[in-house]
């Protein structure tokens, strides 16, 4: 199963829009989804592992796929094909 991880921050003005994109797609596609706060211990580990310097950042199956708010159509196409 595809795993989508969205790295966000409370102070991020674009993160609510990115969350909405992935939550809406969750209703259409079958994938595992989690939201991780950039400033949490888990978020800090992901930031180190993937050299994340900007939020929102979307990681799909252990690869950064989107930095910033993903376009819903592009995100849909990403979920339709293997990453």
Listing of model-derived features with the role each one plays in the protein:
Residues 1-27:
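Local sequence-structure signature of Cys/Sec-based thiol-disulfide redox active-site neighborhoods
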Residues 13, 41-42, 73:
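Short alpha-helical
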Residues 16-20, 45-49, 70:
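Generic recognition of short, well-ordered alpha-helical segments
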Residues 31-44:
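Thiol-based oxidoreductase modules, predominantly thioredoxin-like and allied folds used
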Residues 48-59:
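Structural micro-motif
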Residues 60-83:
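Non-catalytic, surface beta->alpha helical segment in thiol-disulfide oxidoreductase systems
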């Amino acid at each position: 199963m595809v795993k989508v991880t969205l790295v966000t921050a409370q102070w991020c003005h674009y993160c609510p829009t990115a969350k909405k994109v992935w939550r809406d797609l969750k209703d259409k596609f079958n994938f595992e989804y989690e939201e991780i706060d950039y400033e949490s211990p888990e978020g800090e580990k992901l930031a180190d592992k993937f050299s994340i310097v900007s939020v929102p950042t979307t990681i799909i199956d252990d690869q950064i796929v989107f930095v910033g708010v993903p376009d819903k159509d592009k995100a849909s196409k990403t979920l339709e094909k293997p990453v």
